[in-house]
Design a protein with these regions (language model features):
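Transmembrane-helix motif of ABC transporter permease domains
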Residues: 10-19, 54-75, 83-106, 128-181, ...
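Short cytosolic helices in intracellular loops of multi-pass membrane proteins
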Residues: 183-202, 281-322, 381-388, 397-407
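Helix-loop-helix
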Residues: 242-270, 333-401
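Hydrophobic alpha-helical transmembrane segments of ABC transporter permease domains
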Residues: 145-157, 161, 213-263, 348, ...
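Juxtamembrane "helix exit" motif at the C-terminal ends of alpha-helical transmembrane segments
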Residues: 22-39, 74-79, 106-130, 165-166, ...
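An intracellular "coupling" helix at the cytosolic face of ABC transporter transmembrane type-1 domains
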Residues: 215, 289-299, 303-351, 393-396, ...
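Juxtamembrane/interface segments at transmembrane-helix termini
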Residues: 30-39, 78-89, 110-115, 171-186, ...
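Primarily ABC-family ATPase nucleotide-binding module
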Residues: 42, 48, 210, 310, ...
Length: 424
């Protein structure tokens, strides 16, 4: 799966993690010194509203730093372990990381836009709203109406500019990822078909090379991008949520704690991930077994097309009974998994509002800041809840991975897993 596309996968991914850690440490520890050396001014911390968010000195320095680090890493691997797919696997992966991070920064730019826009909405409504139903509506001067209208239209135009950029980045990223994943599938297909004599005796070998590599590619296309997006969202929005925590002084039941929004999102997400991992622990094995009983039933039918002695009704009845039994077990396990998952997700919809009740009641934040907090908390929580949101897909990927692992074992002349050993 990985050897066909990545050079020396085990060492490669270890080096990716280690190199990323070193580069991140240098960036967060010495970016001001690096920026000063290159002539960039990183002293301004005020958020820029609009497309200028992506052209600040901080961003320009990041672009230079990222591509320099990526180029150095790729150059070393091109020299150390030349691989036919290295341009796609190394530089392609780096491009996906960058485009995903840029897409997340588009969300940050929109979140920065929320404060002035919704604060302006709040001010406009406050200017004209009567204090009680008995009072007449307050007449707002025409000059004020014109001024606020122009400001709102200006902010809407800024939002449209950011939105068009978001659409462009999304389309480019998805287009590239589709090609990236198909190249990966091509590499797997070439690798497995070249070893056909060694894997042909594994149950459902043809299905595994055709269907399972296809399913692996399809799942990785969605799951891979989502996990990268989750990690990049954390990098982008954790500082935002950390900064917004200064507007929230205390939490219900807990009281005053440092950085309450950050702590609450972390605890709530870990709880949800742990809950779903526990209730869904049996699902990968059941999905894998489901593929096996379906393959056995299909294989007998295929044999019956050429051999009148095969695919007899009693045999087919027994094989389909296995299919039915496994599906019913799968349905039962998914039932209580979905109960736990939906309970958690419904509670998640109002969790942040519960946290903010003391702050809202005290009038400690404006409507614009509230919108920023809701967005940042949602982004961070959803990233921490990656397993919660993707568990069903992860289960499907694990079942495909188990099936393709049989090919890896056969190619390496290792004993097959007991579940895959066929009587000869």
């Amino acid at each position: 799966m990985f050897k066909s596309f990545f050079p020396n996968p085990r060492l490669f991914f270890i080096s990716v993690v280690a190199y990323a850690a070193v580069c991140s440490f240098i960036w967060y520890g010495f970016n001001e010194q690096i920026g000063g050396f290159l002539g960039f001014d990183l002293s301004s911390s005020a958020p820029v509203i609009g497309l200028g968010h992506f052209l600040t000195d901080s961003f320009l320095l990041f672009y230079i730093y990222y591509f320099a680090c990526t180029g150095l890493f790729a150059l070393v691997w091109f020299r150390v372990a030349n691989h036919p797919w290295q341009w796609w696997s190394i530089l392609g992966s780096a491009f996906i990381l960058f485009s995903t991070y840029f897409s997340v920064q588009v969300s940050v730019a929109i979140n920065n836009w929320r404060r002035p826009f919704f604060d302006l909405v709040q001010d406009a409504l406050k200017n004209s709203a009567p204090q009680s139903s008995a009072e007449a509506k307050i007449e707002v001067p025409a000059e004020t109406v014109t001024s606020i209208s122009n400001q709102l239209f200006d902010l809407i135009i800024i939002f449209a500019e950011i939105a068009f950029l978001a659409i462009f980045v999304y389309v480019v990223t998805r287009f590239f990822v589709s090609h990236f994943i198909f190249r990966w599938r091509t590499a797997m297909n070439d690798y497995y078909t070249a070893q056909w004599e060694q894997v042909r005796n594994i149950e459902g070998a043809s299905q595994r090379i055709q269907e399972d590599t296809m399913r692996f590619a399809e799942i990785m296309e969605g799951l891979g991008v989502s996990i990268v997006d989750a990690v990049m969202t954390l990098f982008a929005f954790l500082p935002v949520l950390w900064a917004l925590s200064e507007y929230v002084s205390e939490l219900p039941l807990v009281g005053v704690i440092a950085h309450p929004l950050f702590v609450a999102s972390l605890v709530w997400s870990v709880f949800g991930t742990g809950l779903l991992a526990i209730v869904g622990i049996k699902l990968p094995g059941l999905e894998f077994k489901n593929q096996r009983v379906e393959a056995a039933f299909r294989k007998e039918l295929v044999y019956g097309e050429d051999d009148v002695e095969r695919a007899q009704p009693p045999t087919l009845k027994e094989l389909f009974a296995n299919v039915r039994k496994n599906y019913f077990r799968l349905y039962f396990n998914y039932m209580y998994f979905n109960v736990a998952r939906m309970l958690y997700l419904q509670a998640d919809n109002i969790f942040v509002y519960i946290l903010l009740i003391p702050t809202i009641a005290a009038g400690a934040i404006t409507f614009g800041i509230l919108q920023q907090i809701l967005t940042a908390f949602s982004q961070v929580s959803n990233s921490f809840q990656y397993l919660v949101n993707s568990w069903t897909t992860i289960v499907q990927l694990l079942s495909v991975y188990k099936r393709l692992s049989s090919f890896e074992a056969a190619i390496k002349h290792e004993p097959l897993p007991a579940i895959d050993q066929l009587a000869t």
